[in-house]
Amino acid sequence: MARALTIDPAAIRRLRELPKHEKVDCLLALSDLPAVFGNPYAHSGLGIRKLGTKLFECRGSLALRFVFQDRPAEHFISFLGDHDEVKVLLRNGRYH
């Protein structure tokens, strides 16, 4: 059974500010995430990558990545940003 998606308000704000084509790509990626997470043999194009204990990233669009936590009842999307912003986030440990 697919788990729920919970999205941090800051990630929602960032998503709303995107141009329409990027917003559509990101929303499609989010809609696929619960179904493909944990199924490594399904090619989804999301590029899910483990960043740490229970911490992952997936492709939102060509330039943007979602950082999310794998929680028991949900996938918590804590950040949306480009590659460099994700590197800074991880270096500073500012994810929830």
Regions found by a protein language model. Give the residues of each.
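Enriched for short, Lys/Arg-rich terminal
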Residues: 2-4, 13-16, 56-96
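Arg/Lys-rich, positively charged N-terminal/basic patches that mediate binding to nucleic acids
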Residues: 1-31
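Non-catalytic, surface-exposed connector residues within folded enzymatic/regulatory domains
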Residues: 5, 27, 42-45, 80
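Intrinsically disordered, low-complexity, repeat-rich regions
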Residues: 27, 38-39, 93-96
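A short, surface-exposed loop/turn module that caps and links secondary-structure elements
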Residues: 32-59
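Flexible interhelical turns and helix-capping residues at alpha-helix boundaries
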Residues: 19-22, 41, 79
